[in-house]
């Protein structure tokens, strides 16, 4: 009986780790950044991290407008990457799919931010979201040069 309980606990621990967001830098190091699918995912992750920040800090706070504009920029880039990947796909269908993915990621990131705030006193303590946002900002800045 003890072996069965230990096995069940082990399975649940694997499942809980399987659904966590991989740090974006780690993801990019493991994948080909020239692949439109990878670029679309990167764009959706960057959009989601910025949207999560807008939800967390609120409209009246400093930084909201920057985060919201970054979200919109990354959303549009994700759409462009989708066009490269699936040129024949209906734009409305593509937009809905991209938006759905971004919202799913945003919901997870918002939970991570809240959990970090509750357990550590800082929204960025114990997670990779600030590192992801910084990476996204560096990418946008390097493209703009």
Question: Where are the regions that the model predicts?
Answer:
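Sec-dependent signal peptide recognition
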Residues: 2-7
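Residue-level signal for mature regions of secreted extracellular proteins and peptides
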Residues: 9-11, 39, 129
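N-terminal signal peptide c-region/cleavage motif recognized by signal peptidases
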Residues: 13-16
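Cleaved targeting-peptide boundary
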Residues: 18-27
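Interfacial loop at the N-terminal end of multi-pass membrane proteins
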Residues: 27-28, 116
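Domain-scale activation on soluble regions of proteins
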Residues: 30-31, 144
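Short N-proximal segments of mature Sec-exported proteins
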Residues: 32-88
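Compact alpha-helical subdomains of small soluble proteins
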Residues: 75-145
């Amino acid at each position: 009986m003890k072996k069965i309980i230990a096995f069940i606990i082990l399975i649940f621990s694997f499942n809980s780790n399987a659904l966590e967001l991989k740090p974006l830098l780690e993801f990019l190091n493991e994948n080909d950044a020239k692949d439109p699918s990878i670029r679309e995912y990167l764009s959706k992750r960057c959009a989601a991290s910025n949207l999560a920040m807008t939800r967390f800090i609120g409209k009246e706070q400093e930084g909201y407008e920057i985060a919201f504009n970054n979200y919109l920029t990354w959303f549009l880039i994700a759409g462009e990457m989708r066009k490269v990947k699936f040129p024949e796909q209906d734009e409305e269908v593509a937009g809905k799919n991209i938006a759905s993915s971004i919202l799913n990621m945003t919901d997870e990131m918002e939970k991570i931010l809240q959990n970090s705030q509750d357990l550590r006193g800082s929204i960025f303590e114990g997670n990779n979201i600030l590192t992801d946002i910084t990476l996204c900002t560096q990418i946008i800045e390097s493209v703009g040069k």
